[in-house]
A protein has these predicted regions:
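Conserved donor-binding/catalytic core segment of Leloir-type glycosyltransferases
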Residues: 31, 41-57, 63-66, 79
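Nucleotide-activated donor-binding/catalytic signature segment of Leloir-type glycosyltransferases, i.e.
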Residues: 91-109
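Short alpha-helical donor nucleotide-sugar binding micro-motif in glycosyltransferases
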Residues: 108-109, 116-121
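Aromatic "clamp/platform" in nucleotide-sugar-dependent glycosyltransferases that forms part
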Residues: 129
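Short hydrophobic beta-strand element within catalytic cores of glycosyltransferases
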Residues: 146-149
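Conserved acidic donor-binding segment of nucleotide-sugar-dependent glycosyltransferases
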Residues: 161-173, 181-186
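A short, well-ordered alpha-helix in the C-terminal region of glycosyltransferases
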Residues: 188-202
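C-terminal alpha-helical cap of glycosyltransferases
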Residues: 205-218
């Protein structure tokens, strides 16, 4: 993919493809860090999924990760933003497993709601089977929301090979162990959130496009 196609996608209006750090927000790194710190002091952990409810995005695996954390006694909430062909299947799974109190299918959301989702969540989960330009990973890091993602495309690079987020192995118990290790230690979560903010804020949209294009094109 070249910079032209990346730019065209960046200009599209969908939540998935529109790269927008909402840099008009006047919060600086200090206030972002303080907010990330305050989130770790809460007893409840907020998880976010943003994407189509399709097999390629694996939203069922997202639900199962949070479900297993819940079974292990963690106070967790998951919100999924997006629509897709798997919605009925996910609704059935949530109902059959009595997860209505912790898992919420929110449908498509506007930019303002997505922004608030990043700001209020501890983690973004993205277990995609493929990802051309993982905009949501960088946006999550920008707002101090730690990504949990599959190592596709340039995701491992973006996440510092695990220093700025949790890299999924797509084996449920192993992945839940990884997440549990982060949420059990406040300093580990804060370090990941802080490093993600520092890394993502190096980039303007143009610079980010150029860097990702270089990675994708080798």
């Amino acid at each position: 993919e070249d910079n032209t196609s990346l730019s065209l996608r960046a200009e599209s209006g969908t939540n998935e493809d529109n790269f927008d750090f909402a840099q008009s927000d006047k919060e600086d790194n200090t206030s972002l860090s303080l907010r990330a710190e305050s989130r770790t002091n809460e007893n409840q952990f907020m998880f976010l999924f943003i994407g189509t409810l399709s097999k390629g995005k694996q939203p069922l695996y997202v639900i199962q990760l949070v479900e297993e954390l819940y079974k292990r006694g963690k106070n967790v909430i998951l919100e999924l933003y997006g629509e897709g062909s798997l919605r009925k299947e996910l609704e059935h799974y949530i109902s059959q497993n009595n997860l209505e109190a912790i898992v919420f299918l929110k449908g498509n959301q506007n930019k303002e709601t997505v922004l608030k989702g990043y700001q209020n969540s501890h983690f973004l989960i993205l277990p995609s089977k493929s990802e051309g330009w993982p905009k949501v990973v960088a946006e999550a890091m920008f707002w101090g929301c730690v990504p949990i993602a599959s190592p596709v495309s340039c995701v491992s690079y973006m996440m510092g090979n695990g220093s700025r987020g949790v890299i999924l192995r797509e084996e449920l118990n192993q992945d839940v162990d990884q997440i549990e290790a982060v949420i059990s230690k406040q300093e580990v979560y804060q370090k990941m959130a802080s490093e993600g903010q520092t890394w993502s804020r190096q980039f303007t949209t143009d610079k980010f496009e150029a860097e990702i294009s270089k990675l994708l094109n080798g």
